[in-house]
Curated annotation (Swiss-Prot):
The modification 2,3-didehydroalanine (Ser) is found at S142. This is Histidine ammonia-lyase. It catalyses: L-histidine = trans-urocanate + NH4(+). It comes from Bacillus subtilis (strain 168). One of its GO terms (molecular function) is histidine ammonia-lyase activity. Induction: By histidine. It is found in: Cytoplasm. InterPro entries: Aromatic_Lyase (IPR001106), Fumarase/histidase_N (IPR024083), HutH (IPR005921), L-Aspartase-like (IPR008948), Phe/His_NH3-lyase_AS (IPR022313). GO terms for cellular component: cytoplasm. Contains an active site 4-methylidene-imidazol-5-one (MIO), which is formed autocatalytically by cyclization and dehydration of residues Ala-Ser-Gly. Pathway: Amino-acid degradation; L-histidine degradation into L-glutamate; N-formimidoyl-L-glutamate from L-histidine: step 1/3. Keywords: Cytoplasm, Histidine metabolism, Lyase.
């Protein structure tokens, strides 16, 4: 059980809820804050004080006063009119993350919603009823209005949901799950949609996958080092301590562990004095990606525990302030940074692929072909990797430098953070395929060298991946191999590190 209190949610907690399907519940203390904040909203409505979002219109209509009897209609109309998302739906895990993150944000007690609304979000989450939320349509300020409106639709029994593997009308899913729709009252519609939970949900899923992929790239790069008889001296601790970046030091340490008893690596001067940068500089390049991942994680964990609603209610309602916490600029920057960092893992991996298949750069069979000339072997795999890498370069263009004014120029600067997060997720997917291609080529190279000479760790890795992709004995449709191994990388852990006592205590 993950307990939500509005301030302590971590990426590890999110992973447990999203992928291990642990249930989530609100702490008693946070629910008390919610009730106090709600009482303040009800006083404002009763006393007919003019407060944005409670008894006024929205955006450009903020100066239009709404009568008390129209309060519920105001919130419903907001959700209906703002549900303008288009395109394919977010993956269910992202929809699931939105439910979790919105509940956690509301539990801070600054938004004035009823406890029943948070209970509805958690009921959807725990019973695995996932709103169908189109991916396109958010500007990233005022928060993720369109995506979160589709989330809100499901809570009130409208729109669509995924339930038990099927897409269906929301009311059908609610009945099957035993959930009653809620009716939104004062401020609740705005509190649901005025936030950054779509970009942050997409961002945290991207981060979780990127972190796993970063570890996987090191292990597969270790196989490549063996396949190319790489020089192990480049990973000597003294080199990396001399520079001082902890992440670089950690990558080098892990590579040394993976290759500690390898009979395929060489020493400087044995075959060559130096290796190419794509081998020699793995700690420097991969380490820089880890630096970025640390930055991204820090910003995500702040945002996951942030109040991003507007207005916010303080001091039991004595202080109600309109501000701009819904602006997604911090996450937009973080996601753009993540795109760049993961793209670099693909860039350097593609160069290692080239070194594995190019006969001018190694002493392996040309293109790792069992019968060069008659059979092309891995030749076009490098083309596929090059295409994916080039696509990443386009996707890595920063979304956060763009802005288009909206709402009659009232909302005249926006973050495009959700676009950045969506593109980051695609960059990760592309990079995973590049890494799968490197793995296929590295497996073949190590097999040619003699798997019996490989390190204990990489030998185990080799055996696991050979269950997914067989040896290349003749040309075949390699697309199937790439997709199978890509799927395996996404779903499986590569020899869980916690089972290796030698790695305990290392920064893994």
């Amino acid at each position: 059980m993950v307990t939500l209190d509005g301030s302590s949610l971590t990426t590890a907690d999110v992973a447990r809820v999203l992928f291990d399907f642990e249930e989530a519940a609100a702490s008693e203390e946070s629910m008390e804050r919610v009730k106090k904040s709600r009482a303040a909203v009800e006083r404002i409505v009763r006393d007919e004080k003019t407060i944005y979002g409670i008894n006024t219109g929205f955006g450009k209509f903020s100066d239009v006063l709404i009568q008390k009897e129209d309060s519920a209609a105001l919130q419903l109309n907001l959700i209906l009119s703002h549900a303008c998302g288009v395109g394919d739906p977010f993956p269910e895990c992202v929809s699931r993350a939105m439910l979790l993150l919105r509940a956690n944000a509301l539990l801070k007690g600054f938004s004035g919603v009823r406890a029943e609304l948070i209970e509805q979000l958690l009921a959807f989450l725990n019973k695995r009823v996932h709103p169908v939320i189109p991916q396109q349509g958010s500007l990233g300020a005022s928060g993720d209005l369109a995506p979160l409106s589709h989330l809100a639709l499901a809570l009130i029994g409208q729109g669509e949901v995924f339930f038990e593997g099927e897409r269906m009308p929301a009311m059908t899913g609610l009945k099957k799950a035993g959930i009653q729709p809620v009716t939104l009252t004062s401020k609740e519609g705005l509190a649901l949609i005025n936030g950054t939970q779509a970009m942050t949900a997409m961002g945290v899923v991207a981060y979780i996958e990127a972190e796993k992929l970063a570890y996987q790239t090191e292990r597969i790069a270790s196989l490549t080092i063996e396949g190319l008889q790489g020089i192990i001296d480049a990973f000597d601790e003294d080199i990396h301590l001399a520079r001082g970046y902890q992440e670089q030091i950690d990558v080098a340490e892990r590579i040394r562990f993976y290759l500690s008893d390898s009979g395929l690596t060489t020493s400087q001067g044995e075959l060559r004095v130096q290796d190419a940068y794509s081998l020699r500089c793995i700690p420097q390049v991969h380490g820089a990606t880890w630096q970025t991942l640390g930055y991204v994680k820090e910003k995500l964990e702040i945002e996951m525990n942030a109040a991003t609603d507007n207005p916010l209610i303080f001091n039991d309602g004595d202080k109600v302030i309109s501000g701009g916490n819904f602006h997604g600029q911090p996450i937009a920057f973080a996601m753009d940074f993540l795109k760049i960092a993961i793209s670099e893992l693909a860039n350097i991996a593609e160069r290692r692929i080239e070194r594995l298949v190019n006969p001018q750069l190694n002493d392996l069979p040309p293109f790792l072909s069992p019968h060069p000339g008659l059979q092309s072997g891995a030749m076009i795999m490098q083309y596929a990797a090059a295409s994916l890498v080039s696509e990443n370069k386009t996707l890595a263009h920063p979304a956060s430098v763009d802005s288009i004014p909206s709402s009659a120029n009232q909302e005249d600067h926006v973050s495009m953070g959700t676009i950045a997060a969506r593109h980051a997720y695609q960059v990760i997917a592309n990079t995973r395929r590049v890494i799968a291609i490197e793995a296929i080529c590295a497996l073949q190279a190590v097999e040619y060298r003699g798997i019996e000479h490989a390190a204990s760790y990489t030998k185990q890795l080799f055996q696991e991946m050979r269950k997914v992709v067989p040896s290349i004995q003749q040309d075949r449709v390699f697309s199937y191999d790439i997709e199978r191994l890509t799927d395996w990388l996404k779903k499986e852990s590569l020899i869980p590190d916690h089972q290796n006592k030698e790695l305990r205590g290392m920064n893994i």
